[in-house]
Amino acid sequence: MENWRTAEIFPKLDVSPNVFDDIRTQTAEQLFENLRLYYGDDSDRYNISFEALLGIYCNRTEWIDFFHTSIAVAANVIRFNDLDKMSLGKILFYIQLPRVATGNDVTAPKETTVLVTKYSEKHPINISFELSAACLAHLENTFKNTILDQMLNINAIHTVLRSLKNSADSLQRGLIYAFIKTILKKAPPQFILKTMLENKVNSKQILSKVQRSNMFQNFKNKLINSLFFLNRTSNVSFIYRYLCEMVDSTTESILNNTNSYVLKDGTPINGVLLGTPNTIQILSNALSQHISQMTMSVPVSYGTFVMGKENAVTAIAYQAIMADFSNYTKNVATETQDQNKKSEIFENQTQHADLKTNIIQLSDKTVVLDHLKKVYKNTNIEDPLEQKLELTFFFPMGLYISKDSGFSTMDSRLKLNDTMENNLPTSIYFYNKDKLLQRIDYSDLLPSLCHPIIFDCSVSERIFKNAAKPTGESFNQLCQVEFVREPPSTFLSNLYNLYEMKKEIPKTTNMLKNELTTEDFYKSENFTLKTELHPFFDFTYIQKNRSTDVLCSPRILLGNIPLPLAPSSFHEARTNQMIEQAKTNNLNYDYTLKLVVESLTNTAYPELAYIIELLIHGNKTAFQILKDVVSQCITYWYNIKHILLFCNNFEMIWLITTYLGDESIPGIAYTHYKNIISILKLVKRTISISNFNEQLCGEPLVGFVNALFDNRLFPPFLNSLPKNEANAIITAGNTPLTQNTVKLRNYEVSDLNRMNLLDSTEIFTDVDRPSFETIVLSKIFYFCFLPALTNNKMCGAGFDVKSFILDFFYTEPFILPDDNFCELPITNNVLIELITEAVGPSHALTDLSCIGKQLFKSILYLTENTKILEIESSLDPSQRHGSSSNFKSLQHVLYNGLCLVSPINVLKRYFKPIPFNRFFSDPIICGLMNIEVQTYLNIFPHYQRNDGGFPLPQALSHEFHNWQRTPFFVYASCCSNSLLSIMTLATMHCKLSPIAIILQSRQKIHPGFAATLVRTDCFDINCLLYSSKSATSIMIDDPTVSTEVKDISTTYNLTQHISFLDMGLGFSSSTAIANLKRVKTDMGSKVQDLFSVFPMHAYTNPTVNSWVRHHVGIEKPNPSETDALNILSFGKINKQSQSILLHGQQAICEVVITPVTSDINFYKTPKNPRGRASCMMGVDPHNESEARKSLYDHSRVDSDAFVATTNPWASQEGSLSDVLYNINHRDQLGYNPKSYSPNAVFFTDTEIFKTNKFMFKLISDYSIKTKTCLDSDTDIQYSCSEGTDDVTHRPCQFLQIAFPIHCSSNQALLESRSKNGMTQLSETHFANFAIGECIPLQNIIESLL
């Protein structure tokens, strides 16, 4: 390998430099054979053939001269012949600061000289070319006499010249490319540079938290306001002002050479503004009044690097190249100094030429405006000013705007029909990049919402357990609840122990949550936030074995979501959706409901009615015996008191409508009873959103959607056990009931055994079991109808049957023979008074005795004493998954009990109030009937409430294992007494299961939670680069050539050594994202398929798993074990049909499940999609503990929304979305590594900490450089901090924000705004919303179409 100078390659060959042009002009270019692309030199070209004679290649590409490009304005080029030996360049500049003379005895400033240090940056470039052996052979021969020999030799000469000139041109292009890349490295984005200049600090000053946070916020604001500034406005003054800011933000060069780059009138050029051809064209059109084409003087040769007294260079560490430095220093400050060669750094005595270019006047600066298209044309190198940009967008779906706060900001531009889709939107509309309307609704989200991992809280539970337990006041509020299990045999005997102890019971977290308003719930003062991690699970602390433990239980029902996250009005709106879907909203039962409410709240309710209920206890034969008595009671109380008796008992209403339709009671009264049953059936039909006949896992599919159809949920009052199809564990004594332990009632014979066991824990049931429909209607009646119409002002009660029978009927005449029984009247005054109260005072004593004797006859069908059953059951197969597989729901049922709507006075000693369920635990009724409860309420009057706050006996109080929890009771306690309230309580029984979500979504019914959709899009962008004149010195030498000889050819490698030296007093260059070139992704509605992200997960029940996958649209079964391991190890990319690529690469929308009450204003400005800011400029991110608290400690106010969070299900450690999208948790779940997650950068804590450390360092670095080297540290090198490009190209990741898009919950609203160009304005139209984009991308993209 040899090293040659370019001039030494062919020393014996004397050829004119114009020989190439001469040959080209004398040959017909149309006959050139070398129109194909080839590499190197082909030896076949020198074979004797006709084609070879004409085979002369003509390169039509324009040659590039560095000095004739506008980028040269920013350079000062000097030749340094020994540059290849230089390893480090350190140059010190003496700069004298200007002074101002003063007077009036003011001390004049002293002469000040600043010593500025600059370091050179080495950047060699190289290019190679090949010459074939045949070519070199011809060059060694002299010209012969034949024309053919001369032509072959000329061809060889031409090959060499072409290669040399092409290589020289490549070096020139390479010099430009290397130079512009170097400038870009020291040209910070304008939004950073402007922020730093506005927040100047002393370089040695430590930034305060406030300063750092302000700088970060300014970064963000300036980026948002300046992104695509050429596209976003046609305001010429705005564009001009922005360009002036770019120019004014930069500093001048230390080297202020006024001899080069000046206009004809002597005006010096101050800098150069470079862009892509498209950007420059836009600027030229917009600012044509400020642009003119003028001639400027440019140098045509390099300067020479020498030592001289004028050049301010005092020391150069160039190793061997400056060994004779002492020769120069001897002459410093001596007369012989002038003998040194003059420096052309300052005295450019080089030749100059005139060049026409576009000049723009920006502020007081004269700037060259140009592009470098000719440099990169036909090359495989992209223009460095053509760059990539990734932006993340977020938008909400399914948010609920309450009617109370509903308003319209749209004047009268829009009118929407009064449909539930408009009153409770379940879709979101927006445009993709081709302005095609996109719509996403809940059915589109099913691949994300119904993945098994959503319904498994194992990871969340583990994180919650490992987290620090509450301390101080939080401990007192959250960690005092203790759940006690007792055998049901002791329930009644220990019923009032709690009240006798006169001990205040701590509130559960559910009670604490539901006492808060929506606004208060999201505040940092809400210490229950830490337990709100998942929409489908309750987390809480409990006392267990004298230590604090955690409890995680499935919420089971939608209505169990805390009311601040799913308020009452939202549930009513959902109900209206179901009513509209079922087409049942045109029926009017207002009068019946009004009558029932008056009846249930009447304090004079006859006590005999309760006795009749007990004697009949749902038995048809007993009802026939007492039919006349029932008829008389109903008739009297309806006609005289206008009260509908027995409307508190479902079985009585059912029997009345079945057997009293023969005009034995007033027709209007009978109609009301029929209406009650019709209402129940109407509710049943409304909430039945699936086919009754469809089965899944051997159960009705409708039972997977609503718990009222689930056999595992029992009615709260039973007189006969239904068929235990769910295999629930029913316990009445100390052991669970079985078919052998449940005895049948035999009314037809004298069953002394049953009579003896009336007050035992033995369970007896009728032969006729209630049907499925009857049980469903009974549950609707007791869980929906009664609570809605009484506002929970009811109480369960037990009855001492044996004592009552002995006291009232084990007397004369009832124990006399039949003849005497019929003749003698009743002598029991209490019984006579009870009967008189029930049937009216107009009856004679004989009539009253006859009624009493009818009551006695029904004793044949006597029931047993009241008992409390404890029913424990697993969840349905779709909810029996993951951590819920072993969960057992718990409910307590009153067997042979009563539902009291008024306190008992006369027969108080036989009745026992039993607050067994929060629907049926009215403290007033309990207190009036039991002295212990009354005393307890006097001590703790705040317990006189019907919203579930009245404490139940501890053995009956299992909030987190019950089907219905606090939100149900709170709603029922304050709802209106209307049909809507009844249906709302029914719809609140919808399950939080994948099957329920699928079927509701298909019917366009809101599933109970909103969603935040997050999408990342990729863009090709054009940038602007401004650099001050002579901002960078370029030191170059002659190229060196090395050869590599082979048999058929010789390769020549040309290396150009270049060293760059920053000459700016500060930042002398800046960049800006000027305009959008193209959108690479489709900006569409493709939703992330979690089944492909987490391929191994499946529902526990294979039938449920297949059903869900089929209805979600995942037809493929779960991968085999081998396939799953391959996916987890190597990843897998889903193959999609090519038709989907019509609009570009699909962007993935990921789903973050969000409460419906999240503030809509949060989505109108750039925010973090997790619902809480991840910026930690207020703390030191290197302090891991403080950084983690800033991220996850919700007792600290969020810096963006000024609340703790807007989405507790995503922002907290261990929350649902944190588990789904935090890569550190994904590793525990097994995921497809080739799946892309736009959410990962917002949820992965390690990456967030790393990003914040970087931003912390970035701000610190740039704050040091806010001043120039003249008034700051003179050793500062003004170059971009490491990672600045990443901030510019991926700002959302580093600023931890996503941008809102132009979207609307209603298509009409979106279209109305789009046609008016109102894409940046956010509006509200009652329940609907429209969000404006902060970056007007829709208008920008439209201008590109």
From Swiss-Prot:
Per UniProt, which keywords does this protein have? Capsid protein, Host nucleus, T=16 icosahedral capsid protein, Virion
A GO term, aspect molecular function: structural molecule activity
Give the UniProt family note.
Belongs to the herpesviridae major capsid protein family.
Is Nucleus tagged as a keyword? no
Its localization reads: Virion; Host nucleus
The UniProt subunit note reads as follows: Homomultimer. Makes the hexons and eleven out of twelve pentons. Interacts with triplex proteins 1/TRX1 and 2/TRX2; adjacent capsomers are linked together in groups of three by triplexes, heterotrimeric complexes composed of one molecule of TRX1 and two molecules of TRX2. Interacts with scaffold protein; this interaction allows efficient MCP transport to the host nucleus. Interacts with capsid vertex component 2/CVC2. Interacts with the small capsomere-interacting protein/SCP.
Its GO CC terms are: host cell nucleus; T=16 icosahedral viral capsid
Query: Pfam families, per this entry?
Result: Herpes_MCP
Functional note: Self-assembles to form an icosahedral capsid with a T=16 symmetry, about 200 nm in diameter, and consisting of 150 hexons and 12 pentons (total of 162 capsomers). Hexons form the edges and faces of the capsid and are each composed of six MCP molecules. In contrast, one penton is found at each of the 12 vertices. Eleven of the pentons are MCP pentamers, while the last vertex is occupied by the portal complex.
Tell me the organism. Human herpesvirus 7 (strain JI)
**Protein name in UniProt:** Major capsid protein
Tell me where it mainly resides.
virion
Family matches, as HAMAP family: HSV_MCP (MF_04016)
